[in-house]
């Protein structure tokens, strides 16, 4: 399971970025020759688990830490091409993975049914650790990604934006 977590959260973003490289480099060279400045955006998705760790999730935390390193490296390598590479690190966001375990979906992985969600007692404790007092919404999480994709973030580069409610 450790390798699967690395593959999903670290290797896949690397491969997507690598696939973009030829076309984005060529376009950037043409724009530079024409005197145009066009910013392209890469927004990787990570988690505060990648910087803070999370008990019982060494695989996930390691994979998300890898995304942060990938983001910073791509930012350094592609900055001259006007490719802004940033990441968003989510804290506790309400999703089916963080729903109450009693109400959560069941997912099948390799033929085994896995119940998703967090026990209510842990959900309550997690909310107490957030200074804003509640988990974030999917819309609030999307706002950070939207900002990093917008022209307002053209000078934001190689950064990880924490969407955590203050965790």
Residues covered by each model-derived region:
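Substrate-binding pocket helix/loop in short-chain dehydrogenase/reductase
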Residues: 1-3, 126
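Active-site helix of classical SDR
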Residues: 17, 63, 71
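Residue(s) in the substrate-gating loop at a strand-loop-helix junction
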Residues: 47
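Active-site "substrate specificity/gating" loop of NAD(P)-dependent dehydrogenases
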Residues: 53-57, 79-80
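Short, small/polar-rich loop/turn modules that mediate ligand/substrate recognition or access, typified
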Residues: 79, 84, 156-158
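A glycine/serine/threonine-rich, flexible loop-to-helix segment
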Residues: 80, 92-129
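C-terminal substrate-recognition "lid" of short-chain dehydrogenase/reductases
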Residues: 134-163
């Amino acid at each position: 399971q450790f390798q699967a977590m690395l593959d999903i959260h670290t290797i896949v973003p690397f491969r997507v970025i690598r696939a973009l490289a030829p076309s984005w480099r060529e376009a950037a060279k043409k724009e530079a020759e024409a005197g145009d400045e066009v910013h392209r955006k890469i927004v990787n998705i990570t988690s505060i688990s990648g910087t803070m760790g999370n008990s019982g999730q060494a695989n996930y935390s390691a994979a998300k830490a890898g995304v942060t390193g990938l983001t910073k490296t791509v930012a350094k390598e592609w900055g001259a091409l006007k490719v802004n590479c940033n990441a968003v690190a989510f804290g506790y966001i309400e999703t089916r993975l963080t729903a109450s375990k009693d109400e959560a979906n069941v997912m099948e992985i390799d033929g085994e049914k896995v119940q998703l969600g967090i026990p209510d007692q842990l959900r309550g404790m997690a909310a107490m650790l957030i200074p804003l007092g509640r988990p974030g919404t999917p819309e609030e999480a999307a706002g950070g990604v939207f900002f990093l994709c917008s022209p307002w973030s053209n000078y934001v580069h190689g950064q990880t934006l924490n969407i955590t409610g203050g965790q």
